[in-house]
Amino acid sequence: MPVEVAEPDMRSIQKEDHDDAMHEKSYRVGIEVPVSVSFTNSGQWYQLPGGGRIWRVSLICKGAQAIGLNYNEIRLPAGADIFVYTSDQKSVIGALTSTEIPQNQKFTTRPLSGDGITLEYYEPPSVKEQAVIDIEGLVYIYRGFEAQNPENNKSLASGSCEVNVNCDEGLNWQKQKRGVVKILTKVGAKYYSCTGSLLNNTAQDFKGLLLTAAHCSKDSNNGVASDSDFTQWIFYFNYEYSGCVPGGTTITSIVGAQKLAISETPSDIGSDFLLMQSLKSVPAQYNAFYCGWDADNENSPSGVCIHHPDGDVKKISTYTSPLSTGTWGSTPNTHWLVNWSATANGYGVTEPGSSGAPLFNKEGLLIGTLTGGDSWCDNTSGVDKFGRIPYSWISNGISANMRLKPWLDPGNILEADGKLIMNGSFNDKLAVADFTANTFVIPIGGTINFYDLSAGIPSKWHWYFQGGKPSEATEKNPSGIVFDRFGKMNVKLVVTNAFNSDSIVKEGFIDVRAIVSPNPCYGVVNILTDKNNESGIVIEVFDFQGKIAQRFEYSGSTSDSYSIKLPESGNLFIVKVIQGKQVQIHKVIVIH
């Protein structure tokens, strides 16, 4: 039975959100509902044929637009994994292993669309270590995630004037858009939506520096995100429609960050910046762009802002008149003032949820982060204010944790030429796992050689062979791996270099075939499978017209060889071998 979680008091929440909107507070999208779910009090264990077991637990919280899970502790043994999926299984996270889940800290899995969610833990028979899964909170999302619903084909969250980033207006900003992220922030039990950007630095070490607004780390009552809260922030990459019209949304994300620097003091917000470092390297397959920036005081005559208004997919707003300087709090010249321009596909403005979004100059360099303003679809002439990178560089305070400079120019490289400019870049140093093999189809008992194709010059390799002997290897190119189990087998490779680790799982990569011989035959064939057949073996014989002629069932057999006498009439038969969920088809010719 699923764990039914009581819906939060939405009437009270909506009233609070209405009051917050009137006072330009952060855009709340969700609330954490406390739960206590673990092996000892919830879910169901299932023993698997041949060993191993699964623990499965489902949670339902009616009315949710999306649901995520917060873990007080999660510790998985090597070889074990978890999947998290929606009730209809249209959205899936996983497999997550001990490689992907950080140790000794809290963790979260991102919200999935709908009001029901299931966690499935798989434990192979070889595991001796005790896993720990302690779910302490259900993340109840009630707005801002409309585009993540696979059934939706319209952009429902943000204003109708907004322009999708892959319309014509975004053609010259395709690199920069890959450095813009949607952020689901956690402040205590409250969840907010903001926008941020991934930054390059002069060391070009691709550390995962993420910039947003300082006020994104506060709730509507000025409560501040704790260090523990930051470990459960979620950063969404490439959250956009594939074209100018709704459709083709993809969702990729990383979890967790560490706060490095913030502009705010108890008396003044300053230039309203927050700089973080992601706890995990940005996966190479995200093809993320590390944005360049300009900390000089030069004005920009034109440019764009790329953002996630109201938590929606990525939008682009364009300015075509020179910026001016102004203030948000009490300190002068902390912000750029921006007026937006109409374009071919709309009139891009900003909205709640756009906070922290990058402002780019005409050279494509980041020069500001959004604090707020009064532009919206019914007030397109309103002015928006972006904290200036030139001010954030060193002017908010004297310590490193109030400046951008120590983190963006750690070696003081830019002091030599006097230009505080850094171009953006894609990361060509990351390890990206990939591999191939000398063959993909083998008979029972056959051997395969594997070849590493990973980018980034890995220094360590860890292979996992489902059904293989040995089941693991640490060489670069392992050879002679024996597969003596019937069916399609998964192969996983984890590679590591000086910068990161990456993994890839190729499902059903090796097709281990039953041996049907002799073929051609004189009416009798022998079928060799394997002894791992607790689920039983079914052999079906079809004639050339597709009609079933024979059916044999072997339940609980420990044999790996079966002799079948084929029908006396006919020269061509199809032999179907079924073992559990594995099905193979063989053509057999009979000589009379």
Features from the language model and the residues they span:
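Proline-enriched interdomain boundary motifs that mark the N-terminal boundary
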Residues: K429-A437, R513-V516
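Short, surface-exposed beta-strand/strand-loop-strand elements in extracellular ectodomains
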Residues: L76-K90
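Serine endopeptidase catalytic core focused on the charge-relay Asp
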Residues: L112-N339, P352
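C-terminal subregion of chymotrypsin/trypsin-like serine protease catalytic domains
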Residues: L210, A225-D229, G247-A257, P266, ...
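Surface-exposed, flexible coil segments in extracellular/virion-facing regions
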Residues: P458-I481
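A short beta-strand segment in extracellular, disulfide-stabilized domains
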Residues: G445-S454, V524-L528
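C-terminal outer-membrane/trafficking sorting elements
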Residues: K460-Y464, F486-V494, D502-S517, C521-H592
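Catalytic nucleophile loop of clan PA
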Residues: S197-G208, G348-L370
